Amino acid sequence: MEIPIQVAVRICPYTEPSENRKPVAGAEADASAFGNAEAKAESFSDSEDNKNDASNRQRPEESTDANGNSEGGRQLKKETLPTDSNGNENGTIVPLGSGCCVQAIPISASALGLPSALPGGRAQDSIAAGLIQVGAHTVPVTHALGSGTTQSQLYYQTVFPLISLFLEGFDASVVTYGQRGQGKTYTLYGPGFECVYGEADQGVVQRCVRDIFAHIAGHSERTYAVNVGFVEICEGEVCDLLDMGNVHCQSVEEVFRWLQIGLATRQPKSAHSLFTLTLEQQWVSKEGLIQHRLSTASFSDLCATERWGEPPPGNPRDAGLQMLELVVNTLTDPSIMYGVNGNIPYGQTTLTTLLKDSFGGRAQTLVILCVSPQEQHVAETLGNLQFAFKVQCVRNYVIMNTYSDDNTPISPETMPNGSSNPGAGPLAQVAAGDNFGLQFAASQWFKLVSNAEGLFAKLMASNLISELEKEQIEEWLFLKQECEECLSSTEAMRSQKQLVPIQEAEEPEESVSEPPNSDNDTDNESQRPDLADKLESLMEEFRAKTDALIQSKHAEFLTKHPKAVMQSQERDKESKLDAPPEKDKEKIEERKTSIAGRRRSIQPGASLSTAELALLNRVALQQPTAQPPPSVLDPESSIDPLESSAGEGLRQAAIAAAAANAPIEQLQKKLRKLHAEIEGRQRQLKEIEQTMQVKQNIISELVKNSDTRSHAKQRFQKKKAKLEAECDKAKKHLAKALIQGREKGETERWSAIIAHIEHRLEDLSSMKHIAGESGQKLKKLQQSMAESRKQQEELEKKIRKESKLRDQLETELAKLKESRDGASGGKELVKLDSPEQQGRQLKAVQARITHLNHILREKSDNLEECAGGEGPAPAQQESLRHEIRNLRGTRDLLLDERCHLDRKLKRDKMLTQREERKLLECDEAIEAIDAAIEFKNELICGHKSIDTSDRLQREKGEQMLMARLNKLSPEEMRTLLYKYFNKVIDLRDSSRKLELQLVQLERERDAWEWKERVLSNAVRQARLEGERNAVLLQRQHEMKLTLMLRHLAEETSASSASYGERALAPGHQTSSGDFDYELDFYKAAATTTTTTNHKALVKPPKSTPSGAALEKYKDKEQRGAGRNIFAKFQVLTRYASSAASAAAAGSCSSTVDESTALIESTTTATATTTTTTTTTTTGGKGKERGLPNIRQDQLKRLMPAPTVTKVTRQKNKIIIQDASRRN
């Protein structure tokens, strides 16, 4: 809902100055408003500059607010003025000659038929719009209020509609704007809460509060929560006037009480104030739905505009008001909006940030402009009216803040029981099952705390706050983190409680009574660390059951399926297997050739040994028994052993062996990687366990020694308080010496003493901080323990997973090795153990016999065709057989040469480049001879030639190529064949070299991967070892630091003598009352003169103390520091400072220097001193002056406390050495 901002202009009442009234100095003679409020405001502002002027003082019962507005101003009694037909008061429009130039021209709504703004009000009360006329200028506004408008009329006409929307769940905002002394604060808050004023003068805020609580009382079925807040913005800083944040209120009286406290706390200087009231409501609608609404009403009292500069209207002096005008200009001017790309500068100032919802936001806004009718304020009035006119063009996107819980019907258990008391507290009547309001409030508080955390972080980074404030902020941040942990644990419990099973309507109640427990058990198990193992085991079980179910269903389907369909499926399969398409054939052949040629030149199984070659020759030359004569010999039967002897079968066997070895090698490689990973992770796990044990020891020691640290901190605090008191005394004496104009040496001495005490105070603060940071260390160690525990769980999970994978790979590797060994020993007879294996073997033999019968039948048919004369002539067949024998002889020679090269390769492990090429030529020539023998055998069998059988199916280009080849002469054909033969050899040679390079690169990659794995494990191991060593050092440091702090506490308590007790001796004559403080402790010049039964301390004559005495005392203390325990404490503090600044390495050195200075100065503070007694003589240059005698108790008080730390220091030294030796 897009609604423009409403503007109401209220003219301040004007009264002619009385002639007999004494004019107020500094104020304008004609400035008077609600009960001389303006004159009073001017006098208040002038009184800041002229405080001694008696004429600036006003009556004590009249006061102004922080903005100079009249809070106690009351309207003067004004005669009843006649009204015109429109209900306008003619008497309020003062002519220009009388000093007023602003007129309000309200437009009555009675003629328009609009309802009255007041319930049952008159016609003149129903003002809908109006004009403000300033001289010749006229400005239209939403509400034009004359000087005679009362507080009640203003409220019901302008503010009451906003409060109605506020009670429905919309945000509302009321902003007062104007120059100084025109009644802005009076409009909002009235004259105050004094009993002398009636309710008729109450402001807008009080009336809104009464209406809100009246509405609450009238709807007793609703639960509610009302919170108020009151802040002040002064020079960009936000100040909480209530010092409580948002305060919960249950009645009108409580709100008024807090409002009165806030008004009394406001600053007298110019500032903005913001009073907010938040209403949270919840009820059940007639449809049974839970309705939840949250609305906020803000009342902003802005400071005076005080425009200045050129052009004449000028700009407000306040930076917040200037930025507010810039925001309004941006919202109303499309060119400016386009220039900033839609980024409205709300965040430039604090005021615009807080008023973001009021101007261009989601609140219904009313701006009340208070103007002056006087001529001298015309420029500022026009400027403010121009701003108000622009504000009316701003549109807010008003929405209802409702939360209906996704239209969830409320259950009978969560219905409110009976009528609830409105004053019972926030959401007190909500049933136990409905905690939505509390959850929403918690979320809102979480947002506020997050914003506060950001502000605190900025303050910490700005370095504009003291150390005490920093400690408070750090403590607040730790408390916030603890609250977040508590909330996270409660959220987890809540999420577990909300996971309930869905109850089916048709199931009985007994069946649904048990599942919640099982669900809760599973939810609880989800928090356990062994969840992954259980889940994996369940997945394996599920997978096995699924496979078994699929197999059973498949078997059942096969048994129940019709045989006709099964036969049709088998015929389809057979047709597909018998007649594959030619493209598939070509792909299969290409795949076979690629597999056969892949790495054949470098695999040892591809070569033929001498024994194998002899065996193959015997098989080739031997004629098998029970076969037909050579004339009718089956050519294919004669080529089968040749094909096997040609190396195809052995090649296939070599390829199969290589294929069998490849997965074994891959598995072995994976196993090596897994072994390395498991060993590395086990070492890391061991390091983490040791580190966790050391951390746990540190935590237990910190908890055990917390009392010692707190005791030391208290001692340091007491010592710091004593030193602060001594510093204050020294400063007083220094000021006294400066006022009395004493000698320069004494002032320098006091200045040196003060500087020394302040230095000691800084050292004590640092020591107190070191003693008090055990809580932070404990929290950090606990967080580190949690992180280490998480790392331990992750490592254990990875180790279990990798161990399981290793077992699987080992099982698979064992199976592969068994299968390979069984294949290599295939010549041996294997006894079948089970009848199933015998049945499978029998089926395989029967299938082989069937296949051989089919081959024999085909070959007999071929023989019959040859005998019938379909094949070539007998002479031609004999010629072809002769050529085949010649080719076999050539092939045998090539095989002998190849075997010779193989033996040389096995013996020497390398060949020359020419021999490698010769080996490839032999392989290729053997393959070519095999192809030629196969071609001639096909000719003998009467098959068509390969070149002519598929000529009709060739493309046109191939046909032309074959025609050209057929026309070539034998010489040309041999030349072409030799050329392509060399090209094939070159290609195979390059392929072999590439394969060798690939193998080498793969080996290098494996080596680099192994190195990388080893190095990464070493780095992780080193990191964990370093962490463990650091924790060990920290433990040693904490032990030593605890002993040092215990000893320091004892020394601090023992050294009870302070600067006040060690009197400081001045350099000139002082009174006897200051004698105890003026004894010079830093200077061993105190003398004792023994008179008749009296001991007196006499100052040296004409002695002028200087900084040398202080330096002498410091040197003496530093010499004694060698025997003090602070020498060891310095080393410990250096470690603490470096550990504390681990995030910023650059600050380590400065921290060490500060710790060193801390130890040296603390040594000075705890060293015991002795007073040196000297005898004064009468031969001095100056005149001796006797001092009054001192009693014995005073002398005892001046004596330093005896040292009690010598024995304790030796004990602690022995303890530290023993602890270091054990660690």
Curated annotation (Swiss-Prot):
Residues annotated to bind ATP: 178-185
GO terms for biological process, alphabetical: microtubule-based movement; mitotic spindle organization; spindle elongation
Residue stretches making up the Kinesin motor domain: 4-394
Disulfide bonds: none
InterPro entries: Kinesin-like_fam, Kinesin_motor_dom, Kinesin_motor_dom_sf, P-loop_NTPase
Biased composition (Basic and acidic residues): 39-62, 569-593, 787-799
GO molecular function: ATP binding; microtubule binding; microtubule motor activity
This protein's record includes keyword Repressor: yes
Top-level taxon of origin: Eukaryota
Keyword Metal-binding recorded: no
Record's compositionally biased regions (Low complexity): 1162-1178
Region (Disordered): 13-90, 494-528, 560-604, 625-646, 774-799, 1162-1188
Keywords tagged on the record: ATP-binding, Coiled coil, Cytoplasm, Cytoskeleton, Microtubule, Motor protein, Nucleotide-binding, Repressor
Locations listed in the record: Cytoplasm, Cytoskeleton
Family of this protein: Belongs to the TRAFAC class myosin-kinesin ATPase superfamily. Kinesin family. KIF27 subfamily.
Quaternary structure, from the entry: Homodimer (Potential). Binds microtubules. Interacts with ci, smo, sgg, CkIalpha and protein kinase A catalytic subunit.
Function of the molecule: Regulates cubitus interruptus (ci) processing by recruiting multiple kinases to promote its efficient phosphorylation. Scaffolds multiple kinases and ci into proximity to promote its hyperphosphorylation, which then targets it for SCFSlimb/proteasome-mediated processing to generate its repressor form. Hh signaling inhibits ci phosphorylation by interfering with the cos-ci-kinases complex formation.
Protein name: Kinesin-like protein costa
